[in-house]
From Swiss-Prot:
Cystine crosslinks: C73-C230, C164-C384, C185-C212, C393-C425
Any one GO molecular-function label of the UniProt entry: beta-1,3-galactosyl-O-glycosyl-glycoprotein beta-1,6-N-acetylglucosaminyltransferase activity
Protein name: Beta-1,3-galactosyl-O-glycosyl-glycoprotein beta-1,6-N-acetylglucosaminyltransferase 3
Family named by the database record: Belongs to the glycosyltransferase 14 family.
Keyword RNA-binding appears in the UniProt entry: no
Glycan attachment sites: N108
Role noted for this protein: Glycosyltransferase that can synthesize all known mucin beta 6 N-acetylglucosaminides. Mediates core 2 and core 4 O-glycan branching, 2 important steps in mucin-type biosynthesis. Also has I-branching enzyme activity by converting linear into branched poly-N-acetyllactosaminoglycans, leading to introduce the blood group I antigen during embryonic development.
Enzyme Commission number(s): 2.4.1.102, 2.4.1.148, 2.4.1.150
Amino acid sequence: MKMTGWKKKLCRGHHLWALGCYSLLAVVALRLSLRLKCDVDSLDLESRDFQSQRCRDVLYKNLKLPAKRSINCSGITRGDQEAVVQALLDNLEVKKKRLPFTDTYYLNITRDCEQFKAQRKFIQFPLSKEELDFPIAYSMVVHEKIENFERLLRAVYAPQNIYCVHVDVKSPETFKEAVKAIISCFPNVFMASKLVPVVYASWSRVQADLNCMEDLLQSSVPWKYLLNTCGTDFPIKTNAEMVLALKMLNGKNSMESEIPSEYKKNRWKYRYEVTDRLYLTSKMKDPPPDNLPMFTGNAYFVASRAFVQHVLENPKSQRLIEWVKDTYSPDEHLWATLQRAPWMPGSVPYHPKYHISDMTAIARLVKWQGHEGDVSMGAPYAPCSGIHQRAICIYGAGDLHWILQNHHLLANKFDPRVDDNVLQCLEEYLRHKAIYGTEL
């Protein structure tokens, strides 16, 4: 008996409906399968699934940090002048209108830590076994601008690393509370156990790092190297690139260490006293202990764990530390001198062949106003595209291509109130490279 027409249509309709349901279920199953393959909590970091393009796409979709507005970050990082000019013009229009994230914003958003970490897109899992097996320690000294601190922390954060944060005792209470609120969301980020009031160019800047050194050595995290940062620093390498660079040091340290000029020698010729600021006295200092020749550098270092241990425990190191406490800007000659001391692990000899400039060391990339100029005429770098503070460039978008060509781990100075576009593009660049291993 033949099936009537309406029955045929009904069967065909049921068939199409079922086929549609099965297709929908297949799509859902495929998406779920992709998500499960990228479940970093249960996935082998060396597995093909984790390293696959599909998995990386899923990760990047959830963790990307695209620049706001319509600036061309890919072009800016490649040095495309049209993209750079557009970003600089855009910055002139928006920087006066831009409202930075406030202490109150962070106090509110961190009430729910999981929401905070997800919304601010912190990477909460190791991206490779190499990174997992090579934890890095950070000493982060801050005193203002909570947004700068949070963005720096997000940029250098990895769950296998360990972070000590020193907040200036003189900082506003709301700032200190906001820092505490942020770090309370991470098991591997903590406040230094001893906080000091930090006075510019005085011993207290070194003491802040020493306090973090003591705390970090007490940590159960088997970190290999210590990097120190301030609030205007930002990384220019991914965590994976940092691990590779630190492994290549093979136990050596990396920091500026050069023969001081006569001008710099005056910094330790007379004693300085501290009240609300640093004052020069007429009291002459004795020569450095242990007939140690003095060297000069900057406040930043890439130091091995063994070096840090000897800073705190070696009697000769302790004598030098006591001696520099009443000098001007001791952070700019203490580390540089210890780096040349023969008893310090990872140090290099006194000989002039081992002098290390800030451009040779990997600790920090800085543009000094006095050295800017025409590169074709021998200047080390082109003029700053941002502004200057204490003769140091606060970077603009026009500096980013040059920045990324250098081998340093971090650069200084950045400030979103001066140029947020350069920071946004650097964030986008680093996040893309962290996930994919390639540039924008």
